[in-house]
């Protein structure tokens, strides 16, 4: 519960065991309507591509902040730019865009109240070493019949 926020979460597969007194499951329409900040943390699937589009933005509070450190195509960039310019969306921050590296004609460039950074968390030597260590640990565990970091969709 960061900064005293009430946390709403949505997933296409509801997992009640992840709900706590500080985090409650909400359907997307409720999440859009109730949130001051929307932060995307999900893989990209055909079903959620463009989930933040004009229609979704219209359901959001005026001045909402949108964060995307997941996948660029989750957001329709033209619709977000329009909402930023009009003030419907108060601000956005992201380290992913629909086409990387970002092109000069990306509609988000030059938009109001947006922070764009490169998606390079993996770049430092320490991060790459950690990735290799995790890969080795995963392989060893798999070979021992005890897989870790299993993701079930």
Locate each region found by the language model.
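Conserved anion/nucleotide-ligand pocket segment
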Residues: 1-8
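C-terminal helix-to-coil terminal segments
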Residues: 98-153
